Amino acid sequence: MIALIQRVSEAKVVVDGATIGEIDRGLLVLLGVEREDNIEKMQKLATKVMSYRVFSDENGKMNLNLEQAGGSLLVVSQFTLAADTGRGLRPSFSGAGTPEQARELYEAFIDFCKSKGVNTQTGQFAADMKVSLVNDGPVTFNLQV
């Protein structure tokens, strides 16, 4: 399971001209599901995302996690993160989870984060989305479990 996280000062997702998810300070999470992923991996990754210290403390050092920084999550499904780009000029998605598996783990990720008290906004699974953000830093990390 893959989470490409970006520290943002704001981010939003638009589908069919309507904003469906929007946050101020927090993390934009692009979430990719691979074939071997399961609930245990999802919980481990969600915990890592929420606990990862990417926000600056009073000394300017990246030392605060999402909760300590008072941030929110915007979680967007992103199956292309599971692409194999090692050969040729066209990505292969054979390692990506099935749509059913991906939807289940995406929704479970969101529910898990919400259950921990994190303000969690979302995109729309399998939709054509317009994602906009202001990357704060820029700070971007690729987390995998």
Swiss-Prot record:
A GO biological-process term: D-amino acid catabolic process
Subcellular location(s) per record: Cytoplasm
Predominant location category: cytoplasm
Homology family: Belongs to the DTD family.
Subunit relationships: Homodimer.
HAMAP family: Deacylase_Dtd
Listed name of the protein: D-aminoacyl-tRNA deacylase
